[in-house]
Amino acid sequence: MSDCIFCKIVAGEIPCDKVYEDKEILGFKDINPKGPVHVLFIPKKHYATLNDIPSSDLSVVGKIFWVIQKVAKEQGVAESGYRTLINTNRNSGQIVFHVHWHLIGGKPLGPMA
């Protein structure tokens, strides 16, 4: 999608601080981190929200969760704890409409509001 900032990152048009990449998934550090570790994971294929991923592409969702736990170990937060989060649509706070998972850790996060 031409106006999607995450699609531009996937295409290499906008730089990112990459922590993981394979043919389907990209993981990179959030530019406005909510903790010492804050990584975003996106499917390289554009889906605006979680609601838009068809059942034929569900394997990428499972793979993203596997990648999140791998990167949590690499970033040193797997044992102390981390949060995974997906915002879906405006009322949840989704700002970039390319589905993405947050991995946040490195400090006590407390309960969700």
Language-model regions, residue ranges each:
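HIT superfamily nucleotide-processing domains
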Residues: M1-A113
